[in-house]
Regions:
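Membrane-interfacial terminal anchoring regions of lipid-handling membrane enzymes
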Residues: 1-689
Length: 689
């Protein structure tokens, strides 16, 4: 009935195969049980005068997919009845078994329409409806691939049982089909299909089910169902067609709404990926952080990571899209649910052991203030536990700083920072966020920080980690070394993120208006403030990775205007309303860690202070500053650092230090104005906590 939709092309592994398919001794072995695939083969044979597959001739068979009675059971492979008949026939040694694959649709890079791409072949087993749509949209782009024949003489001349011959032939065919499919559509990266069985059959999950069921078969089956349900809830389901659509959509997004997504440091990641398992740990400032990293890895031909996402994002429609892009879902709290905990951990461990790259946000959720949040220990602890089981010890954490000149969620961040209760994620909240897609959003930056080698870190901070092994069946939180090293690693990740900050135009502008709102400000005054901020960051930056915008202060002011952060604009002055200033707090906080030490100095010196008194006061408060702002400077180097800052502030005339070591602000009005800006940065940040 639908044959008119199918216009297949014949492809051959070798020229000899083209000749062999005309022989009446041919037996076709199709890779699937699909009637559409069989129709494509029949039509190809008729068009090219090949031996035609017919039931009465018994000259074809179709391999069947593995089936299980219940999802949590081990799948059972079924061999075709026709293959059993061939194995029982002594004349089969003269037959020519030619494996046949049918592919629907072009490769992603050659596809001419996104709908056709969705319904092209992939590793996922399709329903009848999906297969029908595949034929409707890609029937005229079908190809029938004829493999080299099996060595039937070697197989069927052996004096073995027919059951053994069936099993051997079945395995040879499936291996051939899998290799060819991988070459045609890429490797099977759908961990949902390949990992669930391994998770459910892991010793820790089976042991937990056994303990929970107390010897009751009924309870055991119920626990198995629960475990399967949890695994389905957790696992990702990567899809090449969806990833291709992601690529097209995101390419448009970054280059139309933003002035592109600039990635820094990707070259070293290409080198690291050859020898290491990679764990990506980005800062989390926007919903689109999920997409930014995956997009850049995809365009740079690096393995797509498996992304840890909160279960709150597992929404209808959206959850499916995120799964197809590599997200797997994690509940906010495991609570007393030991079975869920075991299933989740085994899933993470299997990904880790099989060499997948993993991405998670150490902060757990998006920052609403713009400052990095305290890292959550859960995933970090699980990764360390998994690491003990690995034979391969090359694992690198990759801290990543993601910085935007404008985030999509600015208004919701403002409401929540003012005390409004955080709203539960739903489709309406997501769509209200992306409504700002129509606006100009400036630049976005993604910079890789200094990698952290996990083995080296553990060797330094927990020397006995290889000897003090973790028994997964016990309460691992009681391991003191694990309890101590987990927050240390989390803080190191956050510190390396801060060391890779890309300073944006909006963050400099926001810092420059820290003590100004609801009044006009001269643009020249504002421009001078921004120049001072740039100079201070450049002079005292504690990492060479920290980047500043390569545009003038006047251009920064104009860009912030273009981003619609302020409305009142005249040739020589502008005015920031209280609401506009509040909206920009987020961006000021993005770079506060680069200015907080100078802000402290300027605040303390607003009244004359002896240098040694300032240093002593600073050393007392510095541990708290270091903790809150994830600053790299060690406690032993703190005094040296503050002395350098004092000298640098003196050089740019913000401070005076007289012969009696008395520190005070400059007498110059412009410099005194800039000093007030720094002092207000301190007042609005650290002292408010």
């Amino acid at each position: 009935m639908i044959n008119f939709l199918i216009s297949p092309e014949a492809e051959f592994e070798t020229e000899d195969v083209k000749r062999l398919v005309q022989s009446q001794k041919v037996i076709y072995a199709l890779s699937t049980g699909s009637s559409f695939d069989l129709n494509a083969l029949i039509k190809t044979a008729k068009q090219n005068n090949f031996s035609q597959p017919k039931k009465n001739k018994k000259n074809f068979f179709q391999l069947k997919g593995a089936k299980r009675l219940f999802p949590w059971q081990k799948p059972r492979r079924r061999s075709p009845r026709e293959l059993h008949q061939i194995a029982s026939d002594s004349k089969s040694v003269d037959k020519i078994i030619i494996p046949v694959d049918v592919f629907w649709g072009k490769a992603p890079e050659r596809q001419d329409h996104w709908v056709k791409l969705i319904f092209r072949d992939s590793w996922e087993a399709g329903s009848f409806l999906r297969n029908l749509l595949k034929v409707i949209f890609n029937g005229r782009q079908a190809s029938v691939f004829f493999h080299k024949p099996l060595e039937t003489e070697d197989i069927f001349s052996q004096k073995r049982s027919s059951a053994h011959l069936v099993l051997k032939t079945d395995r040879l065919l499936r291996a051939r089909f899998r290799k060819n499919r991988q070459a045609k559509i890429g490797p099977d990266i759908s961990n949902k299909r390949t990992l669930i069985h391994a998770i459910l059959n892991s010793s820790s999950v089976k042991q937990e089910i056994k303990l929970s069921s107390n010897g009751s078969k009924k309870l055991e089956n119920n626990e198995k169902k629960k475990a399967y349900k949890y695994a389905l809830e957790i696992c990702s389901d990567i899809s090449y067609p969806v990833i291709y659509l992601y690529d097209k959509a995101l390419n448009w997004f970054w280059n139309s709404r933003y002035d592109g997504l600039e990635i820094l440091g990707i070259e070293k990641i290409n080198d690291l990926a050859v020898e290491n398992s990679l764990i990506y740990t980005p800062s989390h400032r926007s919903h689109i952080d999920y997409l930014a990293l995956s997009y850049e890895l995809y365009t740079n031909n690096l393995m797509l990571p498996q992304i840890v996402a909160g279960k709150n994002l597992n929404l209808p429609f959206l959850g499916r899209i995120l799964r197809n892009g590599g997200a797997f879902f994690m509940r906010r709290s495991f609570g007393p649910n030991r079975l869920y905990s075991k299933v989740f951990f085994e899933h993470l461990r299997k990904l880790f052991q099989r060499g997948y790259s993993i991405e998670f946000f150490p902060e757990g959720g998006r920052t609403r203030t713009g400052r990095l949040l305290t890292p959550r220990p859960g995933i970090i602890s699980m990764i360390i536990k998994s690491f003990q089981d690995m034979d391969e010890r090359n694992v690198k954490f990759l801290p990543i700083s993601i910085n935007y000149e404008k985030v999509l969620e600015g208004k919701s961040h403002l409401k929540e920072s003012r005390g409004q209760k955080k709203k539960k994620e739903n489709l309406s909240s997501i769509f209200s966020t992306i409504s700002d897609f129509r606006s100009y959003l400036g630049n976005a930056y993604l910079q890789f920080g200094e990698p952290i080698d996990l083995k080296s870190f553990l060797d330094k901070h927990a020397p006995n980690w290889q000897k003090d092994l973790i028994d997964l069946s016990e309460d691992t939180d009681k391991k003191s070394w694990l309890f101590e090293v987990t927050p240390l690693l989390g803080n190191k990740i956050m510190t390396n993120i801060n060391k890779a900050t890309v300073v944006t135009s909006s963050s400099l502008f926001a810092s420059s208006i820290s003590d100004i709102s609801d009044k006009e400000i001269d643009k020249k005054r504002l421009s001078f403030r921004i120049e001072v901020l740039k100079k201070v960051i450049e002079t005292d930056k504690y990492s060479e990775l920290i980047k500043l915008p390569n545009i003038t202060s006047d251009e920064i002011i104009q860009k912030v205007k273009k981003l619609k952060f302020y409305k009142y604009d005249k040739p020589k002055v502008l005015k920031i309303s209280k609401n506009e200033k509040s909206l920009m707090e987020f961006y000021k906080n993005n770079i506060l860690h680069l200015l907080i030490l100078q802000a402290y100095v300027m605040y303390k010196s607003r009244k004359k202070i002896i240098k040694n008194d300032l240093i002593n006061d600073f050393l007392e408060i510095f541990p708290q500053i270091k903790k809150d702002f994830f600053i790299e400077i060690s406690l032993s180097n703190a005094e040296k650092k503050i002395c350098n800052i004092l000298e640098n502030l003196k050089k740019i005339n913000l401070l005076k230090i007289d012969s009696n070591s008395e520190i005070s602000w400059s007498d110059n009005e412009k410099e005194k104005d800039a000093a007030g800006m720094f002092a207000s940065l301190w007042l609005e940040s650290f002292s408010a906590n």
